[in-house]
């Protein structure tokens, strides 16, 4: 039983990644559910504080579809997700971690995982922005600790070398997986790897066959992704 949230940074620098998923989403989503009927998927598409309409209205800054097995809802939500601006270099990842942990309708007894598709770093404690947020006291490490206690794993993709250490620390703190990855066109394949690795015995054979296929093709990047996720596979 897998509850998986896919969280997209929708700011400008990440547009190629979410667009790649939009390109393949009609094939990807049915494939994920056909391999694992006990799967539930949630989607979060987010920007930063500067994308909020007001301090009380997230607007397009935080777009969310809670966990569901409705394939059409997932496909439509991803295709309609709005781009955001992002403003400064850091994004409100600290808030994303907090909201996903606290607000997702996680099923009791499920494997709980979040794939964070992002390329920046979280804001530091004390961050302020133009009346939207003032001296924010959200500490991403404390939020990661809360997630870890609830058994929620945060996976990360080391897209930008400047922030590799924070990606790895977040995943390590939550017992998630940090994968070396940059090729936006293969984003949907990383999502598939994450889902297959945690599908239990029913997806183990497909996971291994897919990993072997990438190795045979000489696809080094995807082979590294599958190697990283191998620790999640149930044998």
Please report, for each region that a protein language model flagged, where it lies by residue.
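Divalent cation-coordinating acidic motifs and surrounding scaffolds
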Residues: 1-235
